[in-house]
Amino acid sequence: RNGKEYPTSTDYFIPSGKYAPLFTKAFGPTPSTIQIVFPDNSPEKVCAERYEYRDDAGGLVAYGDGQTFNVWNGQKYVSYTIADYPELMAGIARKYPNRAVRAGFDGWNVILTLTFVIPSVRGVAGVWTFTTKGASSSIPQVRNTFDAILEEKGFVRGIIFDLNVKFATSQKPNNNSRYPVVSL
């Protein structure tokens, strides 16, 4: 109505980039399941979680893996560890309160990035990435499956996984919102 477009959630994967037409040729325009293969067994390379803290203008104040964080000091990023500074994350939120902190949350975003090969996509050799911020839905689903297979078998490299997306409905009272959940 006002001419603005807003992002909408989908229950299918949307490829982007130079090789998107090859993805669409392999899976069609609205695939809800794709087969992927991890090229490495190292979680930090193929199933990496990152914590980010941004100010209200979108500036990246701090980021890290949950143990080591890089914090902007006004001129450069300086590395700190949770082992040395156990209250580091809360301290950053106190020093740089953003909208989320003012609304009663911790202000941090958790981002999961998967790096994988899609065997069905012919004509390109390389890895694809998928990123999600679904901290209480998609991230635990994917991470728990990845960790369980890695623990059970000792490796994930070369195993064909189904990466799925489907809508879930909120279980909160008086909230019938739908959101996509990705699972492995």
Regions found by a protein language model. Give the residues of each.
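Extended serine/threonine-enriched, polar tracts that run as long, contiguous segments within proteins
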Residues: 101-184
